[in-house]
């Protein structure tokens, strides 16, 4: 049993290591170089390390090699969920200056318009984008000098705004739930400057941008009783801190709920969490989709005489979204030249028909060429490709019957049997009626004699 226990322990350790996510996230430090140009320098976020000092990175400037301390654990939890075989996330660093919120509805967060001295110093904003999660993390580098030579810079994650649904694909007419969570841990100087225990007031802002236009969807400042703009499109947000621990760290929820989404609600959603003089923002992409329904007529059989063309085939592709990306192919299955081939004939598509729910429909037409006896039993198929469908698409088919070559089907045999049975019953019934009439006439004739 000891070797088995050892193998289980090794497997458990390997599983933990695989699911722990990257220990280092490679980034780019992006700064304004003047004249409308941007300058980029390599940087890195060191999230975990083994015993001893961090591994050296001679390719990085010490102030851009950041050993991150995450008191709330939100950043670490997100990275642990990152698959080991996924491409590395995209990360950018930029300078951040603490400022009061500019929106009128958020002015209650900062009664004083000047920034407290406790927030002086350097700040960095880390933006990490991936299909798994999207986050922004406000980092405060350590201000105390380090022993020379400095190989890295310690930084604390003060405010982290995170979503696990950076790309949301919602079925047309269904509710959308856009995940948002955030965490805050004030630095020592901030905590010393604040006399009030418990989480600070915060503001939550959701905006939608689509086709170059943007507007405020929802704003909230829980507990401040400020005059808020009316929420749009029936949007509701779960805006609250998760706990009220006196000294933090604190986590909160800002998830947005949209009922019965429609195509006009597609676009980029910007979620911003406002703290007094600090902000964090993430972007989410919402797309609406609906797979098409497919029907083919006439069905299930189409008839034609040898040397004649079958009747026109109509493939109705109904109530799908988006309109772009739809392709229709006509196939002949089981024909004389193989199991699958392109159906010959004249084909065309109708114009789009728009429905009140935002979905669209169209019809595809095929006028097949004349058939021969070899086409008997072949099947015409309408195959539809659309972004909402699997790679092979979806299809509907009808069977071709060439006149004079098909024997009676099971339905025909059953019909003939029933017809013969009814005819036999009718003959017997008529015979019984005739016999009854002749029997009733005999006594009358005897009395007359």
UniProtKB/Swiss-Prot annotation:
Query: Site positions for May be involved in interaction with TAP, renumbered to this chain?
Result: 428
State whether keyword Transmembrane applies.
yes
Ig-like C1-type domain residues: 292-399
Kindly list every residue the record annotates as glycosylated.
Answer: 253
Top-level taxonomic group: Eukaryota
Q: Which UniProt keywords apply?
A: Disulfide bond, Endoplasmic reticulum, Glycoprotein, Immunoglobulin domain, Membrane, Signal, Transmembrane, Transmembrane helix
PANTHER family for this protein: TAPASIN
* Subunit organization: Heterodimer with PDIA3; disulfide-linked. Obligatory mediator for the interaction between newly assembled MHC class I molecules, calreticulin, PDIA3 and TAP. Up to 4 MHC class I/tapasin complexes bind to 1 TAP. Interacts with HLA-G-B2M complex; this interaction is required for loading of high affinity peptides. On its own or as part of MHC class I peptide loading complex, interacts with ligand-free MR1 or MR1-B2M complex, providing for stable MR1 pools ready for metabolite antigen processing.
Q: What is this protein called?
A: Tapasin
To which species is this protein native? Canis lupus familiaris (Dog)
Its lineage reads: Eukaryota, Metazoa, Chordata, Craniata, Vertebrata
